[in-house]
A protein has these predicted regions:
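A detector of single, family-specific signature residues
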Residues: 1-326
């Protein structure tokens, strides 16, 4: 026990989390005396994590802290957050914060040091939203991934058409608008397009330039090219349908927070999809953030203000939360 640390908790547990093992140290005792420390090691398999949970309950330890090590902390957090009917404090701490605290003995294990700092009240946990919002995150972040896949698939199709001699982008503002998709479907079926077929594919506004567009599409696809275009185009349509499925699921979840949803949607440029992403990342309880400056900093939208001798230095915003920023 470091003489420079003043204990405020009678019981605390520190977890040193790795990919395959969890080292847990329980420190317990009066705040004005040397505490007893007990260390146990568990694997990261579910039965072992259940043993850790049982030890927490048996010890009646309601204050736990661990480093935010990759994704390895997540199943442990999920396992422990329901202990004592939710009346438990679990801090997920940035490792940099603990390294900056002086007083650590050279032979002290990581788990014991975490428990020691927690017992002294020197740890500040990262923001972890409630389970319902973490589950909503799965959907909103997955949607973002699907949108990325859709963009990649569109680029793949556009590149293939360009390499096959079809210059869609020369006269169509959107290759995948209604006119562009009609043309692609016709090429898949017939391999080429004539003026009459093109006239049926084009919408009213683009028909005025039908002769120019016909020149840009004056090519033909081989049997192999038609089959390949069919495959990649069907994949695009499947991805788009899947995106709608994910959006429907996330909308169903976010409608449980109608007041917050309506408030966010009242902001110009924020629709239900964007509002769902915001709610998933920060929840609806803003008490974790003292003011707007804190949440902007957490999101990574507050640039530094480095000034020396009247000269301002160029600075960048921090990484923050990339899902909230985008």
């Amino acid at each position: 026990r470091s003489e420079s640390l003043q204990d405020i908790l009678t019981c605390a547990m520190g977890l040193d989390v790795h990919r395959d093992i969890i080292v847990a140290c329980l420190v317990k005792g009066a705040v004005d005396a040397e505490p007893e420390a007990e260390t146990r090691t568990f694997s990261t398999l579910i039965p072992e994590m259940q043993k850790l949970r049982d030890w927490v309950i048996e010890s009646e330890c309601r204050n736990i802290a661990m480093e935010s090590t990759g994704i390895y902390w997540q199943p442990i957090y999920e396992m422990l957050e329901s202990c004592f009917d939710g009346e438990i404090s679990i801090l997920v701490v940035n490792a940099r914060h603990m390294k900056n605290v002086p007083g650590r003995k050279t032979d002290m294990k990581d788990a014991q040091w975490i428990a020691t700092l927690l017992r002294a009240g020197l740890l500040k946990g990262s923001f972890i939203p409630d389970k319902a919002f973490r589950e909503l995150r799965h959907l909103t972040r997955y949607r973002k991934s699907v949108v990325h896949d859709i963009t990649a698939q569109k680029n793949r199709i556009d590149k293939f058409l360009q390499s096959s001699g079809f210059r869609f982008t020369a006269f169509l503002s959107d290759t995948f608008g209604a006119s562009g998709r009609n043309i692609i479907r016709h090429l898949i079926e017939h391999g080429s397009i004539d003026r009459e077929a093109l006239d049926k594919c084009l919408k009213t506004k683009t028909r005025n330039r039908i002769d120019e567009i016909l020149v840009a599409l004056n090519g033909s696809l081989s049997e192999h090219q038609r089959r390949f275009l069919n495959m990649v185009f069907r994949h695009l349509e499947d991805l788009e349908a899947h995106k709608h499925t994910v959006e429907d699921e996330s909308t169903e979840e976010v409608l449980k927070h109608t007041d917050t949803l309506n408030l966010l949607c009242s902001i110009p440029g924020i629709d239900v999809t964007a509002a769902a992403a915001i709610i998933a990342e920060i929840g609806t309880d803003m008490s974790s953030f003292p003011d707007s400056q804190h949440i902007c900093s957490w999101a990574g939208l507050s640039p530094g203000n480095n000034e020396s001798a009247g000269k301002r230095k160029s600075v960048h915003i921090n990484k923050g939360n990339p899902y909230l920023k985008s």
